[in-house]
Amino acid sequence: MKEHLITQIEKYTPFNRQEELDKKTILYFLRNFNDIFYRENLIAHMTASCWLVNQSCDKVVMAYHNLYDSYSWLGGHCDGDENPLNVAIKEAKEESGLTNIKALTNDIFSLEVLAVDHHIKNNKFVPAHLHLNLTYLLQAVDSHPLKIKEDENREIGWFSLDEAINISKEEAFKIHIYPKLNQKLDLFLKERRK
């Protein structure tokens, strides 16, 4: 499965310079570290996130993450699962309470190397490290009820694409990640209409 993922990332066309450089970094770690799918790798490990949109693709689910003290996309650690799409769907279901989630495409929607500062989790010190993140475009019905995952989030909701950017307190995400995801969503929808 790891080789399949490497091939998929090799074929991925970067959207911008950030993705171009991050693609190289992710491939380097995948090729050179056997434990890259486990958070026991204290330098870097694979994570999967999603841009979870509604049926009309004009709203996205954002959760207020306790750890980051900010609204953020949904996602999590691969923890040994070498299929990041499955991880993104699983995490989206766990964090939102939604069960009707589907992938709009099985392809990688976006990729990023995310710097994580040292922090305390479950009363344990976690050193600074990198998340080698693959993002997937997922969809759910916005009339179905959302449910807070209390051990991770304190609020969750559907937000307009612009609101999703503005409610985040994480500057790097507000400037570099969420606007990029919205731009890519717009291009994806235009391509799908052709």
Language-model segments: residues:
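Acidic, metal-coordinating catalytic segment for phosphate/diphosphate chemistry
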Residues: 11-49
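Charged phosphate-binding loop/patch that engages nucleotide di/tri-phosphates or the phosphate backbone
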Residues: 169-194
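Generic secondary-structure boundary/loop-capping signal
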Residues: 34, 43, 68, 75, ...
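Generic N-terminal amphipathic, Lys/Arg-enriched alpha-helix
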Residues: 1-13
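N-terminal strand-loop-strand
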Residues: 38-73
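Unchanged
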Residues: 79-172
